[in-house]
């Protein structure tokens, strides 16, 4: 992985989230990708499971903002800090997230593995 491909992936991730587009979000992942939303839950496995997750996000979040900062890139992994804010519907609860991604991309630029850690302010 290089910095440019990681930035491109992060930008696409942000656009998919802000656009509430589960198809675009799922397209960022390899067929057999894993997505670990929290360290305490089993990872989602496969693009179909990731699509289902993002479909739920699209139905329950509005006024989404997202930004990220690359912290480190190695040939195997990218690490980024990210921020998001949105209104959860229902009940109209304003939410802010501040988190860290650990990501590996395959040769085609799709995510093979994503692990995240985040904190929430509501």
What name fits each language-model region?
Residues 2-5, 21, 51-122:
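A beta-strand edge to alpha-helix "cap/lid" segment located at domain peripheries
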Residues 44-45, 66:
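A broad, structural micro-motif
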Residues 13-16, 36, 86:
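Alpha-helix C-capping/helix-to-loop hinge sites
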């Amino acid at each position: 992985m290089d910095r440019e491909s990681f930035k491109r992936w992060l930008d696409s991730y942000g656009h998919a989230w802000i656009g509430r587009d589960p198809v675009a979000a799922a397209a960022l992942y390899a067929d057999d990708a894993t997505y670990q939303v929290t360290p305490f839950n089993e990872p989602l496995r496969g693009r179909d499971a990731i699509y289902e997750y993002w479909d739920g996000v699209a139905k329950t979040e509005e006024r989404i903002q997202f930004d990220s900062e690359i912290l480190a890139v190695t040939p195997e992994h990218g690490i980024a800090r990210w921020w998001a804010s949105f209104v959860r519907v229902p009940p109209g609860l304003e939410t802010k997230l501040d988190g860290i991604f650990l990501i590996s991309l395959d040769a085609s630029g799709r995510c093979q593995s994503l692990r995240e850690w985040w904190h929430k302010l509501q």
